[in-house]
Swiss-Prot record:
Keyword Transmembrane helix in record: yes
Record GO biological process: regulation of postsynaptic neurotransmitter receptor internalization
Name of the molecule in the record: Tetraspanin-7
Places the protein is found: Membrane
Transmembrane segments annotated in the record for this chain: 17-40, 57-75, 87-112, 214-234
Protein family membership: Belongs to the tetraspanin (TM4SF) family.
Length: 249
């Protein structure tokens, strides 16, 4: 029995070293997921506010998952150093839950990436029709038009069918140079053509969102499958320690 323990001790030490390294990398991925989630919310938040509410889950899932991973990454290091079989099993169980959560995040990002065009066309058109220049959705429209240098859905003439145009003309956020735009110019589509951005926001926004949601989904899928390695290491180490009644000092 003693000789068997001596033979398995190097294996356990090797598994312990690998799992500590993995747990540290796991902790780093948690920080990355948290950062990507916050970045997605802050960078894409204005654009997402124009989309249906059920499409806003991916950044929050990443933030929540990233925060939890940071905590359990530290727990994994502690469990490995202690050499506690039940802690290692709990760690492996958590990794399996993280694996499923990240798959959900990745799938939601992938689905959102392919559904965005129809959803954005409908909601952005609705936001233009109800534009008043003051509410949250109106400010979101202004932000999109200013930041992407675009105007309207397909082009600036789309504004002529909105109630806002009758009283105020095209919104100043469409102007190439707002100091060079005046209300009279914005009421006249012919004159406005020389003052406002010509490109519509639809193609620019959908391209921007598809690219960045693809990044979020790709990161989630990549990190999710890395959890399988940690699950295998934690289960193997727990099994070796239990079978050989090995205690780490």
């Amino acid at each position: 029995m003693a000789s068997r323990r001596m033979e398995t001790k190097p294996v356990i030490t090797c598994l312990k070293t690998l799992l500590i390294i993995y747990s540290f990398v796991f902790w780093i991925t948690g920080v990355i997921l948290l950062a990507v989630g916050v970045w997605g919310k802050l960078t894409l938040g204005t654009y997402i506010s124009l989309i249906a509410e059920n499409s806003t889950n991916a950044p929050y899932v990443l933030i929540g998952t990233g925060t939890t991973i940071v905590v359990f990454g530290l727990f994994g290091c502690f469990a490995t150093c202690r050499g506690s079989p039940w802690m290692l099993k709990l760690y492996a169980m958590f990794l399996s839950l993280v694996f499923l959560a990240e798959l959900v995040a990745g799938i939601s990002g992938f689905v959102f990436r392919h559904e965005i065009k129809d959803t954005f066309l409908r909601t952005y058109t609705d936001a233009m029709q109800n534009y008043n220049g003051n509410d949250e959705r109106s400010r979101a429209v202004d932000h999109v038009q200013r930041s992407l240098s675009c105007c309207g859905v397909q082009n600036y003439t789309n504004w002529s069918s909105s109630p806002y145009f009758l009283d105020h003309g095209i919104p100043p956020s469409c102007c190439m140079n707002e100091t060079d735009c005046n209300p009279l110019d914005l009421h006249n589509l012919t004159v406005a053509a020389t003052k406002v951005n010509q490109k519509g926001c639809y193609d620019l926004v959908t391209s921007f969102m598809e690219t960045n949601m693809g990044i979020i989904a790709g990161v989630a899928f990549g990190i999710a499958f890395s959890q399988l390695i940690g699950m295998l290491l934690a289960c193997c180490l727990s099994r070796f320690i239990t079978a050989n009644q090995y205690e780490m000092v």
